[in-house]
């Protein structure tokens, strides 16, 4: 069982591709994908053996596991550059990332607060007094023109633009947040006891990602839409998956 950290979307496409085109089966693996979401946190399920592999957003929560003695390991990373971003309302003078630290309100999820928010405080002067919970609804952000909000640069802007709203997008990676993203994590015991299985899963996942970016990804996209009815053709193909190319986002052999 492979668990993701959020609802099915194009940013998870390579894993769905590996199921859809048989990349996992060809290497002897029978893989089911359990999507995450507001009501499904897959991270604690990994440590207790309810899932075998986890897709994580960035390395900070993985570091936190190490700090707290949770026996998990990162075995691969798909994205070299994290698509995590902060959004600002247009026309508010927030064209520079440094200006966001002055916003009275920052809508942030719990996971965000425990991971990249800590970096934002340490490196850019954000303060906990700014925090309000992000409930994965952009309404409060668009209504409060002085607020800022976390988001995924290849996800939320699509729904916002469909509503006629074009946010100012600041990639954390362009402002010093250096971490791999869309990582594959498993239990340390799995790496020790079944290294060949771990290697097979990583290899087949990378094949799935290559095929998703450069091959026929229609079947994978249909799986995504079936798993997550909020996923539409419009937000799956924007930005087009092939724009998430190896030079910018995805690790390549030898890198």
Regions found by a protein language model. Name each.
Residues 84-94, 181-196:
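A bilobed periplasmic-binding-protein/Venus flytrap-type ligand-binding module shared by bacterial periplasmic
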Residues 150-151, 179-186, 202-209:
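Active-site-proximal catalytic alpha-helix in oxidoreductases
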Residues 1-143, 147-151, 170-171:
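Short, glycine-/small- and polar/acidic-enriched structural segments
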Residues 26, 99, 172-177, 192, ...:
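Short, solvent-exposed loop/beta-turn-alpha elements that line the ligand-binding surface or hinge
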Residues 192-255:
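Secondary-structure end/capping motifs
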Residues 59-60, 154-155, 189:
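Alpha-helix/helix-capping structural signal
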Residues 153, 157-174, 179:
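Extracytoplasmic/periplasmic substrate-binding proteins
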